[in-house]
Amino acid sequence: MQEQPLALVTGANRGIGREIARQLGERGYHVMLAARNAAEGIAAARELGLEFTPLDVTSQASIDRLAGSLERRKLGLDVLVHNAGVMFRHFDPEVARDTLAVNFFGPERLTQALLPHMRAHARVVIVSSGLGDRSALAPALRARFADGALDRPTLVALMEDFVARVAAGDHQAAGWPSYAYAVSKIGATMLAQVLARELADDPRKPRFNALCPGWVKTAMGGEGAQREVSEGADTAVWLATQAPGGPTGGFFRDRAPASW
């Protein structure tokens, strides 16, 4: 019988993800520290006394192996933190494809694969960004994201449309910005909302929320950033450890609802 609550944190070999994993471990969770870079992931897990699990969120085969491992071990998931992310300084069709693959499609597919293994009152936390601001979209496109009836298949189709239009060279005419990271985080924040609506009647009562960690001193954020990783991880851990009946479908910064 599973005694400890189980948490899985993606992109946890360094930075904010590593700190989230560390804090959850200190709170009594059995933490699966997931990372694509096996060498860094194994080293981080060993140092923190956690379990390493290999995971490439862009690979359906890798996702399926993880889900299969939970099934074989008869483990139920209490917390899933989507932290893995990439940001490129330039913009082209390859960047659009690769950014969305990690920052949006990875969390969407991983959540779907792990939903059958989630226990009652599971919390799914998406590390998004304030840069994912819907004001970057043209008004007609922005209205589609603001539609309270937007569902997951339609959201996925919108994200696929962005990638396809960048490849075709007409994304701006369709209302998209030339900033793949921003679009990916708009999608990631929206994913928490549509999942909360989609699973509102699930008897397990799962909770789905997204957050902005702020500008954090990590490999992505750089040394000029204003926040330490402990500050960047704080709201994610707070959402991951909410009591049953906590918020769902929200976007948070510094433990408070935020506009985007």
Where are these regions (language model features)?
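Catalytic loop of short-chain dehydrogenase/reductase
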Residues: V86-P93, A120-D201
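Conserved glycine-rich Rossmann-like NAD(P)H-binding loop of the short-chain dehydrogenase/reductase
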Residues: R27-A43
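A hydrophobic alpha-helix adjacent to the NAD(P)-binding/active-site core of NAD(P)-dependent oxidoreductases
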Residues: T99-L100
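Rossmann-fold scaffold of SDR-type NAD(P)-dependent oxidoreductases
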Residues: T10, L77-G85, H121-S129, N209
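Canonical Rossmann dinucleotide-binding motif of NAD(H)/NADP(H)-dependent dehydrogenases/reductases
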Residues: M1-M32
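C-terminal helical subdomain
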Residues: R109, P206, A210-T218, G222-W260
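Rossmann-fold cofactor-recognition segment
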Residues: R46-A61
